């Protein structure tokens, strides 16, 4: 039996309905990954939205304390949607050069904490820009730039990339719960893509 650790924002964790953030509620892909890998892997994840890269860097220490880190075979990880968020017309929450640095630090911490794990990084998913509020925005052009930055700094380290951006960009609006999150069907499709990468990591180990 393999051991898998999922790190990610509300695309993984799920989201409750919140009109202030135009969120309709989403199960996240994490629950489906756990179901799909039942019998072949124990799937662990923080009971927390892992948010932006610096938040993940800080809380990896706490999340790892609940596990036996040396026994984790695969870490599937994402940060990005919080990092590209623009509030009240401001620049992205995390400047892209800082994002690159934070991803490298998160990678180093994952490598230290989970020394035997294969690391997979999931690219951030696409959004429906026209459904967003003008004072709380994400742009696919930003997401694409940050995804490219992630590949630029992580691929040379041997990190496997899971292109959930391309998967989600092909979705029609019926698979979305809101402008950012996905409904049951959309989350399940993402989960299948996550499981495919995780299973490939078993073979490569």
Question: Where on the chain are the PLM-derived regions?
Answer:
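Short, well-ordered beta-to-alpha junction loops that form the rim of enzyme active sites
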Residues: 79, 123-125, 164-166
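Histidine-centered active-site loop/cap adjacent to the catalytic His
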Residues: 176-205
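Hydrophobic positions in alpha-helices of CheY-like receiver
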Residues: 106-110
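Conserved SGNH/GDSL esterase-like catalytic core that processes O-acyl groups on lipids
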Residues: 2-6, 11-105, 144
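Substrate-gating cap/lid alpha-helix
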Residues: 127-164
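Alpha-helix N-cap and loop-to-helix initiation/capping positions
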Residues: 21, 91-98, 135-145, 178-186
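Surface-exposed, active-site-proximal loop segments in enzymatic domains
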Residues: 84-94, 128-135, 174-176
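A short helix->loop->beta-strand "cap" motif at the edges of active sites that frequently abuts
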Residues: 114-118
